[in-house]
Each structure stands twice: as C-alpha cells, then as structure tokens.
Amino acid sequence: QLHPQDLPHLMTDLSKKKGPWQEEDAAYGWMDF
C-alpha cells in the first residue's frame, strides 16, 4: 500500500528504471493501486 509521502521517491525510482515516461504511464501507471 502506498502513502502520499512515498510518491516522490517512488516516482524518482521508477523514472531511473524506465527512463522518460510516456504521458500515459506518468498519469496512470503509478496510480494503479
């Protein structure tokens, strides 16, 4: 389960792994919880 304070770190970690996100991924992918 995610918490609001985890999002900045989570988004940074995902961006390092995936590289530049497509807009769909940025808008919906990490919100799938």
UniProtKB/Swiss-Prot annotation:
InterPro entries assigned to the protein according to its UniProt record, in alphabetical order: Gastrin/cholecystokinin_CS
GO cellular component: extracellular region
Superkingdom of source: Eukaryota
Residue(s) carrying Sulfotyrosine: Y28
Gene Ontology molecular function, alphabetical: hormone activity
SS bond partners: none
Sites of Pyrrolidone carboxylic acid modification: Q1
Phenylalanine amide: residues carrying this PTM: F33
Subcellular location: Secreted
Sorted UniProt keywords: Amidation, Cleavage on pair of basic residues, Hormone, Pyrrolidone carboxylic acid, Secreted, Sulfation
Transmembrane segments: none
Post-translational modification as stated in the protein's UniProt record: Sulfation enhances proteolytic processing, and blocks peptide degradation. Levels of sulfation differ between proteolytically-cleaved gastrins and between tissues.
Classification via PROSITE patterns: GASTRIN
Summary of the function given for this chain in its UniProt record: Gastrin stimulates the stomach mucosa to produce and secrete hydrochloric acid and the pancreas to secrete its digestive enzymes. It also stimulates smooth muscle contraction and increases blood circulation and water secretion in the stomach and intestine.
Protein family (similarity comment): Belongs to the gastrin/cholecystokinin family.
Protein name, entry field: Gastrin
Organism: Macropus giganteus
